[in-house]
Amino acid sequence: MYFIEKKGLLFMKQGSKIGIVCCSNGLRPEQAETIKMLVQILEKSGLEVDLSPYLYGDENGQAGTARERAGALMKFYEDDSVTDIFDVSGGDMANEILSYLDFQTIAYGKKHFWGYSDLTTIINAIYARTGKSSVLYQIRNLTYDHSQSQITDFLNTTLAGSSSLYDFPYEFVQGTHMEGIVVGGNI
């Protein structure tokens, strides 16, 4: 395995293999360049990238059936060489795969699932069924506006063990601190 554990959190290191999936709405064909750029950024950072065969949607926006998308996700959970799984999708189809997931396999694997938008349904199901945390983050942020700061924060957090990806300015309206488990997300 190519990860280190620090304070209960897993971090990747150079040579880590990551999986990229699409559990919700398929990407549009014109987004292939974005994915190509994302893969280049990740590989340049020393990560090995494995892409799901179900990334791009058909005329109805589906990137394979729910069973196929779930199978692609489970393939990465079953692969001991994969340290993290990043979902590049979003939309309104993620809930379709829930009944096809093997939560026992997910519970056993030492890897995080990263997703955003309606992937919250998967993130919350993983927590509810396994007690494992996931990360609410869209990895395509590494290719958007302000990509350099996103790349720096992402690499500092995942490869160097800092928390810069999760640091943002905030102000308490009431009280001075909070603690506990945060469940929720985008939906």
Where are these regions (language model features)?
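Conserved anion/nucleotide-ligand pocket segment
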Residues: 132-187
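Hydrophobic structural segments
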Residues: 76-78, 125-127, 133-134, 180
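Short, acidic/small-residue loops that bind anionic groups at enzyme active sites
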Residues: 101-125, 133-140
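ATP/NTP phosphate-donor binding region
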Residues: 4-81
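N-terminal glycine-rich "phosphate-gripper" loop used for MgATP/nucleotide binding
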Residues: 86-95, 116
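Metal-dependent catalytic neighborhoods of phosphoester/phosphodiester hydrolases
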Residues: 60-64, 96-102
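A short, small-residue-rich loop immediately preceding and capping a beta-strand
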Residues: 82-88, 110-113
